[in-house]
Amino acid sequence: MLVFILRRMLLLMLTMLLVSVAVFLITEASPGNVARNVLGSFVTPEQEASFLNQLGLDEPAPVRYLHWLVGSDWRARRRVGLPLQRLVTEKGFVEWWAALPGGNLVRWKLDGDTLIAQIRRPDGAVEEVPDNGRWRKRADGSSYFWGVDAHNRAVLWEKGTERKAWVFVVGSGWKEVSGGAMDYLPLKKGFLRGDPGVSLRTGRPVAKSLFIRLRNSLVLAGIAFAVVMPLALALGIAAGLREGSALDRSLSVGGMVFSVIPEFAMGIFLILIFALWLGWLPGATVFGEKAPWQRPDMLVLPVLTLTLIELGYVLRITRASMVEVMRSPYIRTAFIKGLPYHRVVFQHAVRNALIAPITVIMLHVNWLLGGIVVVEVVFGYPGLGKYLLDSALYKDINALEAGAMIMVVVAVGTQLVADILYTFLNPRIRYR
């Protein structure tokens, strides 16, 4: 068993690596223009080129993939020559600083030909002092310096250059300035170290936003899962044991009806009844990302929508599997030998009949976490699926790639759990 689990884990890790390449390539090739989404539809080619350069989006695809997966701080540290430190402010924004030997943190800015150091003291106060002593000389006599700027980038400045760049000035928007950096390296630790970057849409760390959205989806999916799965399995087994009876026909027809109704139609129908006509429940989540914790009653309609849809599908799969097992020769042989009915059913039939539903259930765990985007949009629920949809529409590359990889991790993880459960449900299965 241990060898099987280790082998499966290695295979799943290789799968995730290959899928990460596919996710990156598909996201990069998706339609949309990041610069136009951020700067506006009237952006000029010069502004777009400067913006992409500052975000590192004009780098070759292999370099961008490497930075997204394992980060860029290790590369920037060699250029800056100082350790780099990542801070998250009280408002949730990310700041990168270079660490001085004395313990202070520093960033730089260029004012004409004067290099200004912004030194952050341990108490949080920031002091600006001239720091021209850090200019380095090349063989041709030109002066240059690699440092960290206030926009969380490692930048290369050259003294005396008149390079033009478009920068964001608070209160004024994007403005053209002279003396821009010659090269930019946006700083992040990478997906594998829990820092896929900053959202282009919100300016906040993607990891923190994903954690909140994933937590909200887990709440919704967990409640729906806890309600649906025991009920669907019990009803499916009961229907399968009474094939052709009134109970079987009623459950089969009801399950088919609920499973074919589109998610948006089911959600709107429940909103009309319980929110508009009866006024018992709120029809939408109208608060922020922490709404599920502030108003638990807002979970009722989304959970009920998922429950009705999932109940019908899992019930039908369980019923079909139970009917097939009860018709098997070894079940008939057990009855002929005189074994008690309950022993045949619960020790032999049910265990084998659960193999197909377990596969479906594990697949639906992925759907409950990230595939219920329609339900989340209908109810305005701040979950992972809605976050991925908003990121895709905006082409928020960092958020979209990280969210997609979270779904991949969940998918391969649930598949591993399903494979392990098979060995307990069916002793005929042997893994070597």
What are these regions (language model features)?
Residues 2-3, 214-247, 260-263, 275-432:
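Alpha-helical transmembrane segments of integral membrane proteins
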Residues 24, 58, 72-79, 264, ...:
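Phosphate/oxyanion-binding loops and surfaces in catalytic or ligand/nucleic-acid-binding neighborhoods
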Residues 267-275:
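C-terminal TM-helix exit segments that contain a strictly Trp-centered aromatic cap at the helix terminus
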Residues 1-60, 108, 113-157, 211-212, ...:
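N-terminal signal-anchor/first transmembrane alpha helix
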Residues 60-229:
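An internal, D/E-rich "acidic patch" concept
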Residues 149-173, 201-204, 209, 245-256, ...:
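Hydrophobic alpha-helical transmembrane segments
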